[in-house]
A protein has these predicted regions:
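Glycine-rich beta-strand-centered segment in the early N-terminal region that forms part
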Residues: 22-40, 49-90
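C-terminal hydrophobic helical "lid"/dimerization subdomain
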Residues: 1, 267-321
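Glycine-rich phosphate-binding loop and adjacent beta-alpha segment
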Residues: 214-286, 319-321
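Short amphipathic alpha-helix with an adjacent loop that forms part of the alpha/beta core around
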Residues: 193-202
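NAD(P)H dinucleotide-binding glycine-rich loop of Rossmann-like/cofactor-binding domains
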Residues: 46, 82-145
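Mid-domain Rossmann-like dinucleotide-binding core that forms the NAD(H)/NADP(H) cofactor-binding site
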Residues: 116-191
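Short glycine-centered segments of the SAM/dcSAM-binding site in methyltransferase folds
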Residues: 82, 140, 164, 227-228, ...
């Protein structure tokens, strides 16, 4: 089958090459999917660069989310079913396998190619904003990187859950995009201090942060008493100085998580919760995947280069069939 390999094991976007590799064979409890489209995510870039190796037993091929047609079924899935699925790897290919419990039906009337942009982002937002961050109706969420794939999904899911959203983005155009996606307040991080904006509205309850570094102390200031700071990445630096007394005084919770290394049972639990709560939001149009641009599979290198530039709003995709 056609797949994308990293020439030399690591490198820049130009290291991504089309290759012929054996088609995967599903084990017991797994399904085989004929891939129509795959999402491109930051962890794919980190893996390509050699910083984020796949967990034990996961395919070396990039790709953490796909949508397509079931070829070999298991559990509730039968050949011909249209699904989107969370993968431990292997999505940049014509065929992929996954635990049958990590696949979900295409919600509503979404096109299969758009549904491929759901699993990684929706699972991440649900686990971090709603479980670790415990965002409740009436509370306020601050989302950094608001026009990223994670950001646009976090805005929509928080609004669907009855929360307010303060979104930060770089530049006035992206700030406007965040407002159009439903954010109540948008902060241009290039010209405004988001912690000042947050304090002016009484603080925020949850911060979803993928930046780290210089944002850390500002996040502490932005949070109101009892607030929760949730990290999902540290693109701006992973080491910070912790103001312990301030954290104690404000009774803050500092947490974070990754998705890919979680066990199969934990991912199955997340999938069930996502289908129960989030899938109805998508079916009724409250939440939708925002696709910025799609590239053919063979142009995976161009897709990575585009994502790294940071000009996108929403998801970058690969079309396979």
């Amino acid at each position: 089958m056609r797949a994308i390999a990293v020439e030399g094991g690591r490198g820049g976007p130009e290291a991504l090459r089309s290759a012929e590799i054996p088609s995967p064979t599903p084990d017991e409890g797994q399904i085989l999917i004929s891939v129509a489209a795959a999402g491109v995510n930051r962890p794919d870039i980190l893996q390509r660069q050699g910083y984020y190796p796949p967990p034990p037993g996961a395919p070396a091929t990039l790709g953490l989310e796909v949508a397509g047609e079931v070829v070999q079924g298991s559990g509730r899935w039968r050949p011909g079913d249209a699904v989107c699925a969370l993968l431990p790897g292997g999505g940049y290919a014509e065929y992929a396998v996954c635990d049958s419990r990590h696949a979900l039906p295409i919600p509503g009337d979404l096109e299969v190619s758009s549904a491929a942009g759901l699993p990684e982002t929706v699972f991440t937002v649900w686990a971090n904003v709603f479980e670790h961050g415990a965002l409740a109706p009436g509370e306020t969420l601050m989302v950094h990187g608001a026009t990223s794939g994670i950001g646009v999904m976090a805005i929509q899911m928080a609004k669907a859950a009855g929360a307010r959203v303060v979104a930060t983005a770089r530049g006035p155009a992206k700030a406007r995009e965040a407002l159009e996606l439903g954010a109540d307040v948008a902060v241009d991080a290039e010209t405004q201090d988001f912690e000042t904006v947050a304090k002016d509205i009484g603080g925020v309850d949850v911060v979803l942060d993928m930046v780290g570094g210089s944002y850390f102390l500002k996040n502490i200031e932005a949070l109101r008493t009892g607030g929760r700071l949730v990290w999902i990445s540290a693109l701006g630096g992973g080491t910070v100085e912790l103001p312990i007394v301030k954290v104690m005084q404000k009774r803050l919770v500092l947490t974070g998580s990754t998705l890919r290394p979680r066990g199969a049972d934990e991912k199955a639990r997340l999938a069930a919760e996502v289908e129960r709560v989030v899938w109805p939001w998508i079916a009724t149009g409250k939440v939708r995947p925002i696709i910025d641009r799609a590239f053919p599979l063979e142009r995976a290198g161009d897709a990575h280069a585009y994502l790294e530039k940071g000009a996108h709003v929403g998801k970058v995709m690969l079309t396979v069939k």
